Amino acid sequence: MQAAKTSHVRSVAAPLIMYGTAWKEDRTQALVLEAIAAGFRAFDTANQRKHYVEEEVGAAVRAAIASGTVTREDLFLQTKFTYQHGQDYRLPYDPDCDLTTQVRQSIASSLEHLGVTRIDSYILHGPSKSSGLGQADWQTWKTQSMEVWLACSELVTSLSTSSIPSSVVCG
């Protein structure tokens, strides 16, 4: 199976389909290896232990590379930053830090989990609160998202958002 790709923001070739790794728990590594054997080359995960076992995705990636099945360049790895309200008690960052520091800490943890030196796509997964957002909240988010991008641009090829209206991101 040849991975189909389409152009994406900032000339990053993004796959049309990714293998999602949520809710696989102790089967994550085996299922990711099966997906690689079946031809998948793009994987979506998150540094959100509540739903993902990012370390097992990394173990599968390392095993597939070590066996010669794929190279790092063959793979497209996408992971996410999830705000505290979407996490359980196993936070990959210090919740008392500012957003930029939280994202840096989460990226560092993801890089370690995945065993790679860069992430192809990094998603800021939703607004910081689940409800009751006003215009001031959106303005703060827009300002912080640029700070976050500047802080992580050397480790991340593409930064995206999820669950945020395009009118907020595009102005």
What are these regions (language model features)?
Residues 91-171:
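Glycine/proline-rich, positively charged
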Residues 68, 73-100, 125:
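Structural motif corresponding to the early beta-alpha repeats
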Residues 27, 52-53, 85-87, 129-132, ...:
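Short catalytic/ligand-binding loop motif for oxyanion handling, primarily in non-cytosolic enzymes
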Residues 38, 82-84, 146:
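Short amphipathic alpha-helical "recognition" segments used for binding
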